[in-house]
Each structure stands twice: as C-alpha cells, then as structure tokens.
C-alpha cells in the first residue's frame, strides 16, 4: 500500500514539474541582461570532448546494469534457497536453527 502512495506522490511531483517549468523559463527569459550573460557563458565554455563523455557515460551505464543484474540474481537465488529449505523443514518436521 505504501508503494502505491509513493508512486502517486512521485507522479504528482513529476506532473507539477513539467507543468510549471515552461512558466519559469518564460519568466526568466523576460529579463534580457541575464540572458545575454548566460548565453555568452554557455557558448564560451563549450565541452571540448563530448564523445569522450558519451563513451564514459555508456561504460558507466553498462557497469550499473551488469551489477544490478548480478545482485538481483543473487538475491533471487538466496530467497529461493531459503524458501526451499523452509518447505523441506516444514515437510520433515525439523525445527533446527538455520546457519547464518
């Protein structure tokens, strides 16, 4: 139940951020001087190596995906092992403490 409320709250925050972001952008663009300074800074400090950053970002994503997959499989096998041993213990009738 808590998960659904959390999802609803995040969805509302996302919708509000999307709805109000153009309004804030228009409000910021109304003043000409900060725009000129902002655009000058943006073009003056352009990224010299965008390909390198993209490549690094791809590598980081692959590492995160691989790590998540391995962790998920390990957790699933641990839960399955615990469930099987609990079912066997229930069927046999033993009440021994599980090893940790």
UniProtKB/Swiss-Prot annotation:
Location of this chain's protein in the cell: Secreted; Target cell membrane
Entry GO CC: extracellular region
Tissue distribution: Expressed by the venom gland.
PTM: Glycosylation is critical to maintaining the aqueous solubility of this protein, but does not directly contribute to its activity.
Prosegment residue ranges: 18-50
Pfam families per record: Pilosulin (PF17499)
Glycosylation sites: 85, 94-95
Entry keyword Nucleus: no
Chief location: secreted
Keyword terms: Glycoprotein, Membrane, Neurotoxin, Secreted, Signal, Target cell membrane, Target membrane, Toxin
Residues spanning the signal sequence: 1-17
Family (UniProt): Belongs to the formicidae venom precursor-01 superfamily.
Function: Neurotoxin that triggers pain behavior and inflammation in mammals, and is paralytic and lethal to insects. Causes a time-dependent increase in cell leak current. May act by targeting membranes.
Additional note from the record: Not detected in the venom. Very highly expressed in the venom apparatus (3%).
Protein name: U-myrmeciitoxin(01)-Mg7c
Origin organism lineage: Eukaryota, Metazoa, Ecdysozoa, Arthropoda, Hexapoda
């Amino acid at each position: 139940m808590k998960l659904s409320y959390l999802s609803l709250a995040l969805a509302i925050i996302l919708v509000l951020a999307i709805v109000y972001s153009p309004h804030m952008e228009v409000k910021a663009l109304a003043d000409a001087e900060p725009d000129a300074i902002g655009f000058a800074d943006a073009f003056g400090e352009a990224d010299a190596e965008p390909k390198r950053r993209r490549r690094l970002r791809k590598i980081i994503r692959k590492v995160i995906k691989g790590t998540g997959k391995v962790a998920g499989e390990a957790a699933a096998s641990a839960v399955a092992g615990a469930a099987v041993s609990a079912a066997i213990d229930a069927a046999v009738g033993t009440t021994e403490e599980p090893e940790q």
